[in-house]
Regions:
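Active-site beta->alpha N-cap acidic-glycine motif
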Residues: 1-82, 86, 90-100, 106-107, ...
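Conserved, mostly hydrophobic/aromatic
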Residues: 20, 35, 44, 68-71, ...
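Alpha-helical scaffold elements lining the catalytic groove of polysaccharide deacetylases
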Residues: 25-27, 76-102, 116-163, 176-178
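Structured helix-beta-strand junction loops
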Residues: 38, 64-65, 128, 163-164, ...
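Solvent-exposed coil/turn segments that connect beta secondary-structure elements
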Residues: 49, 73, 115, 172-174
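Short secondary-structure boundary segments
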Residues: 114, 136-137, 170-171, 198-199
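Low-complexity, Gly/Ser/Thr/Pro-rich intrinsically disordered linker/tail segments
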Residues: 173, 185-204
Length: 204
């Protein structure tokens, strides 16, 4: 319903890597290097100030074949927005900024800031032509003053991986940047491959 998904095909050993990027703190280049090494596509959900401050990284994401999705311009609590005009402005402002930065069109994938949404939001996103992308596997990786150890991250992420998983990671996490190479290797050894989030919406 409302063209939203949190899970891929559970009959396939395929997983979907997604990164939420509210700001840049020096981890993204390493993450992109690791994704390139593994030939792993990912989706990056970006906000306005991220694109404004890091145009080179955003262009690199696009050039290296990753999906860039809409995390709204201001990263507000969108559940408080019930008017289409304001909702549209949040998404279309980011579309324009991305177009000006990369010369490309932003992919029509939306992730609500902080995962907070109303049913009305999902309906409005759909009316604007967006697929809403949630997730089925995440862990507390966004606290800068309380980053998980590598061991804690592995313990959360490796046993809980599953067929069709949409994995939410934050690109601001030093732990994620440090472990990503070995994490992807481990998942590959378990028989998983990495898919494009467009596969979550086979009809469209």
């Amino acid at each position: 319903q409302y063209d939203a998904a949190f899970l891929g095909d559970t009959a396939q050993k395929r997983i979907y890597l997604t990164f939420d990027a509210g700001y840049e703190n020096g981890c993204t280049a390493q993450i992109l290097d690791t994704l390139q090494k593994h030939h792993a596509p990912a989706a990056f959900f970006l906000v306005g100030n991220y694109i404004e401050r890091n145009p080179d990284l955003v262009r690199r994401m696009a050039q290296e074949g990753h999906t860039v999705g809409n995390h709204t311009y201001h990263h507000w609590d969108m559940s408080k927005i019930g008017e289409m005009e304001q909702f549209r402005q949040e998404l279309e402002s980011l579309e324009m900024l991305y177009r000006d930065t990369t010369g490309q069109e932003l992919a029509k994938f939306y992730r609500p800031p902080q995962g907070i949404y109303s049913e009305k939001n999902l309906e409005m996103a759909q009316q604007l032509g967006y697929h809403t992308v949630f997730w089925s596997l995440a862990y507390v990786d966004w606290l800068q003053d309380d980053q998980p150890t590598s061991e804690q991250a592995y313990a959360k992420l490796i046993p809980r991986i599953h067929n069709g998983a949409v994995v939410l990671l934050h690109s601001t996490s030093q732990t994620n940047a440090a472990i990503l190479d070995s994490l992807l290797t481990r998942w590959e050894e378990m028989g998983y491959s990495f898919g494009e989030i467009s596969e979550l919406f086979p009809a469209g």
